[in-house]
């Protein structure tokens, strides 16, 4: 199905919990304050995905909070994988990696295809300062994900004024591990954080000079990919980027069952969990969400 601006809807991003085991100072805390009565069950998540298939969804991204805090995550993945008439080509997970060592093989066995791991620095002290966590746990989790056969594995590196100095180390690490590096523009959630913003155009300019090959991901906001000495690098720009909006093919579902037409807005959400629990037809909820998508983000 296409929205009113002729963009096909291909991807559903599901936040399954707002809880997290880290405390990153820049986090936008996707989702809402937790209410266990509203938390979607594995069965309900499966039902949501089943309905979404009618509208062309063929990719599922599971996120949080930290999704690995839900012990029933393998069940959630199996429920999605085992849907009848399943056209899902890709089930992926975004995680901070702290618990990945424990769950990587279980997730692969349940049907997970690939994983994105957040890693802003390899420096133990800086990592602890940014997140409050232990970077060695993340590295062990990435190793287990590689061993389990989850692929491609992508490392989400958020560029900030205090992390950009470690870019070369991150590149070397990703090359050694055989994983993809995503260089992500930092989105300040308030005025106090603007000092951490770093212009990634400078980085891309340098990377492009070293690149052996350049590609464009047409259905992912026309993102450019570079191949540098065997390392694949992508740039992700959510800020002031018309391509990010005009090529957006994704809708989002919060942990408490609200459909989000836009990543950056919370004023046009559609409640889909209440109608589902009341035994109502939720097709109209998906249609309403898709119809509320605008061509560009407006504040």
Curated annotation (Swiss-Prot):
S-adenosyl-L-methionine binds at residues 26, 65, 118. SUPFAM superfamilies: Radical SAM enzymes. GTP binds at residues 13, 61, 94, 154, 250-252. It catalyses: GTP + AH2 + S-adenosyl-L-methionine = (8S)-3',8-cyclo-7,8-dihydroguanosine 5'-triphosphate + 5'-deoxyadenosine + L-methionine + A + H(+). This is Probable GTP 3',8-cyclase. Its EC number is 4.1.99.22. Keywords: 4Fe-4S, GTP-binding, Iron, Iron-sulfur, Lyase, Metal-binding, Molybdenum cofactor biosynthesis, Nucleotide-binding, S-adenosyl-L-methionine. [4Fe-4S] cluster 1 binds at residues 20, 24, 27. NCBIfam families: moaA_archaeal, PRK00164.2-1. Gene3D superfamilies: Aldolase class I. Belongs to the radical SAM superfamily. MoaA family. InterPro entries: Aldolase_TIM, Elp3/MiaA/NifB-like_rSAM, MoaA_arc, MoaA_NifB_PqqE_Fe-S-bd_CS, MoaA_twitch, MoCo_biosynth_MoaA/MoaC, rSAM. Pfam families: Fer4_12, Mob_synth_C, Radical_SAM. Binds 2 [4Fe-4S] clusters. Binds 1 [4Fe-4S] cluster coordinated with 3 cysteines and an exchangeable S-adenosyl-L-methionine and 1 [4Fe-4S] cluster coordinated with 3 cysteines and the GTP-derived substrate. Its cofactor is [4Fe-4S] cluster. Pathway: Cofactor biosynthesis; molybdopterin biosynthesis. [4Fe-4S] cluster 2 binds at residues 245, 248, 262. GO terms for biological process: Mo-molybdopterin cofactor biosynthetic process. Catalyzes the cyclization of GTP to (8S)-3',8-cyclo-7,8-dihydroguanosine 5'-triphosphate. The gene is moaA. Residues 4-229 form the Radical SAM core domain. One of its GO terms (molecular function) is GTP binding.
């Amino acid at each position: 199905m296409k929205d009113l601006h002729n963009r096909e809807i291909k991807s559903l991003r599901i936040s399954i919990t707002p809880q997290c085991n880290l405390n990153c100072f820049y986090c936008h805390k996707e989702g809402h304050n937790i209410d266990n009565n509203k938390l979607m069950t594995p069965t309900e998540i499966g039902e949501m995905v089943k309905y979404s298939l009618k509208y062309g969804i063929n990719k599922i991204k599971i996120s949080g909070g930290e999704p690995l805090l839900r012990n029933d995550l393998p069940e959630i993945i199996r429920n999605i994988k085992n849907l009848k008439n399943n056209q899902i080509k890709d089930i992926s997970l975004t995680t901070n990696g702290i618990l990945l060592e424990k769950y990587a093989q279980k997730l692969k066995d349940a049907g997970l295809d690939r994983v994105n791991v957040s890693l802003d620095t390899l420096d133990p002290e800086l990592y602890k300062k940014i997140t409050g966590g232990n970077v060695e746990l993340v590295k062990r989790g990435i190793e287990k994900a590689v061993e389990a056969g989850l692929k491609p594995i992508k490392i989400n590196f958020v560029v900030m004024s205090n992390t950009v100095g470690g870019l070369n180390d991150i590149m070397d690490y990703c090359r050694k591990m055989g994983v993809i590096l995503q260089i992500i523009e930092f989105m300040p959630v308030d005025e106090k954080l603007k000092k951490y913003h770093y212009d990634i155009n400078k980085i891309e300019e340098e990377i492009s000079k070293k690149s052996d090959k350049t590609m464009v991901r047409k259905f992912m906001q026309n993102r450019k990919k570079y191949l540098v000495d065997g390392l694949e690098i992508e740039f992700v720009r959510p800020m002031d980027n018309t391509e990010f909006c005009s090529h957006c093919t994704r809708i989002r579902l919060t942990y408490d069952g609200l459909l989000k037409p836009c990543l950056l807005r919370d004023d046009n959400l559609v409640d889909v969990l209440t109608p589902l629990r009341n035994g109502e037809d939720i097709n109209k909820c998906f249609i309403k969400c898709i119809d509320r998508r605008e061509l560009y983000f407006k504040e």
